[in-house]
Structures are given as C-alpha cells and as structure tokens.
Amino acid sequence: MKRLLISATAALALVFAAPAVFAAAPKQGGAATITFNNDLTTLDPQVGYDWQNWSVIKSIFDGLMDYKPGTTELEPDLAESYTVSDDGLSYTFKLRDGVKFHNGRAMTSADVKYSFERAVNPATQSPGGGYFGMIAGYDEVAGGKATTLSGIETPDDKTVVFKLTRPDATFLHLMAINFGYIVPKEEVEKAGADWGKKPVGTGAFKFVEWVPGQNIKLERNKDYHRAGVPYLDNITFEFGQDPTVAVLRLKKGEIDIVGDGVPPAQFTEIMADHANKDLIAEGDQLHTGYVTMNVTQPPFDNLKVRQAVNMAINKDRIVRLINNRAVPASQALPPAMPGYNSANKGYAYDPEAAKKLLAEAGTGEITTELYAMNVDPNPRIAQSIQQDLAAVGIKAEIRSLAQAEVISAGGAGKAPMIWSGGMAWIADFPDPANFYYGILGCAGAVDGGWNWSRYCNKELDARAGNADAMVKDDEKSVRIGQWKAIFDDVLKDAPWAPIFNEKRFTYHSARLGGDPTLFTDPIHIPVNYDYIFAKDAQ
C-alpha cells in the first residue's frame, strides 16, 4: 500500500488485542464530523487505493471476511462460515442470511462473483486486481480474453466456491481487503462513470451525498447485518481543512476528529497538554521508513558499501527530528508484523565500522544521489542522512522532488538511493508476504515497480512461495518461522537501510466514545466509525 507518511497521516495500526471493550456503554444516535485537508478521489472499492478513500469506503461496503474491531483477528463478515479443502485449492463460503444492499435488494452469490470479476477486469483499472491472481481463470480475464472467472462457482444463492491454481496462505486476508468488497451490478451499471461518486454497498453506513471539495455525508444503515451497530446516525467528512485549523475547531467543539492526524508542528504541544490525555489515541503501524540502494548500480552493487550505509546512519537522531513519533527500525518488517525477529537487532550505528567496510570495499571516493520527497519533514530527514554519509566518506547530493517524480525515478531504476518518507509501504493486510513481493521480491524489481532497490534474490523468492503454500492451521507457526528467516536473509543482503517505524496518533473530541483501539484501528483507517459513538446522543 503506497501512502503519505511522516506527516501524521493515517495508516494501518496493528493491535494484537481482544475485541474492543468500551469504558462507557455505547449509545445509539448522534453524529460526528471528521475533517481532511484533501478531498477524496473515489468511493469505488475496487479502485480506491489510498488511506483517505479507504476511511469512507470501509464503512459503506463489506467483504466476505473482516477483522474484529480494533484488532487484526480475521473473522467471517458477509460470509457466515467457510471451509478449506485439504490441498488448499478450494474455499467454500456460506453467505450470511438477511444481507441487503442499501437499495434494499438481497445480496447473493452472484454479486460476489461479479465483484471479483469486476476487480480483475482490466476495464476497471483496479490497482488491486492482481491480488487475486491465484483464482482460476485470472489470466484470461486480466488478459482481456474472458469476462468471467472460471474459478468462482455459485451452486446456489448462498454458496460461493473459489478454485485456486495454487495454495496461498494469504487468501483469507485477501477476502477482507477492499478490492474484494461486494457491489451490486445494477447500481454499478446505472451509475456508469459516476459509480465512484454514487456508491451503494452493504456496509454500516449509507451514502447520502458528495459535494466535491466540501463534504461527504453518510447515514446509518438501519438494516445492517451486524445487530446493534453502527451507533452514530450520521457522519460528515469535511474537506479543505488544514490540520492546524482543524485542531482549533476541535478545541472549540466544532468537529470531532482531525482526520489527517496530529499536525507535526503542534505535536509536542498537544501531547504535553494534560487536557488531551484521554483525547489522543496512540497505536503502532505496519510501516517501515527506509532508504533504498540500487543494487544493480555501482557502488551499491557492493554488499560492503550497503552494509556501511546501514551502519553510518544515526536513526535515533532522525526519530528525534520527528518529535519521537516513531521508533528506530532494525529490519524491514515492523515490530507489529508477524515474522518480525525481535532477536535480530540489525546494523548498529557505528561510523568507524562503516569506514572500515568502505575501505575493504575498495570503491574509492563515493559520490551518489539521495532522492527524497520535498514535503516536510522529509528534506530534513534526507539532510540528516546526508550528514551521516558524509561523515564516513560518502558524498550524497539530495534530489528533493515532488512525490510523483521520486516514484517515477524509483520505478525507472534511475535513483541510486531513495528515502521512502511520503511514499513508504504500509501493509494492505497483516502478513509478512505483503511486505515482500512488491517491494523486495523479483516481481517488484521491474520498470514501474515499487522495488526501488532492484533487489532480486530468486532463492528467497522460491522460499517465499514455499512458505505461502503452507495453508493448514498446524503449519502457521512453521510458515511464519520461514518468513522470519527470509527477512533475516534480506537484512544480510542489505538492499535497504531501515530507518524507523512510525506510530499513529488520532486526536478526537471528548464527546466521542469507544475503545482507544477503534481510533487507531488496523483496518478501518483512520478510525473504525462503525463502532465509535456519541456520548451525548439523546
């Protein structure tokens, strides 16, 4: 998942906890207002691939699977139950009774089949269609040779069977991401090109209106299949609100959530104010900020040079630059991700050892370029890295550019080094596989890809494939152990210098209630609107 980071924007926060437990009894009724600086681009679940779009999409639509509120624990959603064949090549879902689209029509298995075919169809231009590449018939549909997936069968209105071409341990997670959310064909076709602005789903909230540049309004779905929720009657998302102005409005009681997060310039002040103690929710993110090194170009085709860069960078100082809103990273995986190796401390900050490695590398004087996004604090972070590299004898010129230009250079394989801030990867779902293939595997080391280091270790790719073929419950711990070993070996090859793992902070009004985990929910980002409530509801 590509997201803006290091500007307190929302992201996936992983909470290995029990489902949310409320300090006060939830109440039915009331409303909430959330502000964002920028307008949304689409509410089409098969197309939206941005945290801000997701924040609304996830309350309008549902998938076959979801996660328990405030956690990363999978559970059936539109599916009532599921079974998996012994070979891991067949998944059978029984659909929940009584599920209706917001237009009043009952959802059936035909809607499930249509929704996945729509995601894969190249005409939809879904950025997530490729996630379903293991479903039989994918190549034909994605290649424009067919419009139906042969691997999805609907024996009756309440049963959906997925036939896979290979076992994939991440498949149930894929049933919970927005690209697989269920949509009604007749509404998609009726809206045509405007479907992304006239959404109809099965979710907790119904779409009311979208005034571009101003607001989006939702109302409670009284026929929602989860009894008792949502609690709020109405939600309004206001756009064009600078986060610093939004903070002032929140203090005046005019809004309820600063959607873009705590502004960096006000972070220390807000966190130090005791009055905000119960109004700031803090959570981890499935995020790592890193420096890529293009391993196909000198001098970074030399392992010792890459290891020296890892040892040269003072991560603690960089964390202080962003007001301690992160923790130093030791490896590619963030601490909250399954497969993270707490025993692996990574490369310690050691400039003298870095100098020794550079001498052993025999590359002579090194002059290179460090690309970085030109939005604060990324230029300051890049300057800190530049100073550290200079101290060990590496001269790095900073190329401070717009996000699109940095992404273009990385995808073209032209950038020797890239600081990922503002473009870093946040997992689409809580599994180590999602932190590998696109950004460290051979599949991403192509023109237009997100593996900007161009690191391609075919042995590790094969091991990753073997790990993901382990789909049985009693193989889970073995699989995660294999992924842990894969990422340990990635660290040895040092295509990245992991810098930090950012945390998420959500600032909300005192009138909103709900467990703190709901305000940094790992899936319904930035907040799980389906389960928070208004304390002053009448």
Where on the chain are the PLM-derived regions?
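N-terminal lobe/hinge region of extracytoplasmic solute-binding protein
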Residues: T35-D86, E117, K198-G201
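Local pocket/hinge segments that shape ligand/substrate recognition
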Residues: N37, Q125, G129, A227-V229, ...
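Gly/Pro-rich hinge or "lid" segments in bacterial periplasmic/extracellular proteins
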Residues: K68-P69, A146-L149, K163-P230, N234, ...
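Alpha-helical secondary-structure segments
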Residues: T33, T108-E117, D157-K163, P167, ...
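Detector for C-terminal structural segments
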Residues: A169, V211, A312-S342, D376-Q386, ...
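Ligand-site clamp/hinge motif
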Residues: A193-G196, K222-E269, K395
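Surface-exposed binding/hinge segments that line
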Residues: K94, K113, T124-K185
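Aromatic- and charge-enriched surface segment that lines or borders ligand/interaction sites
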Residues: E80-G128, V161, R249, P299
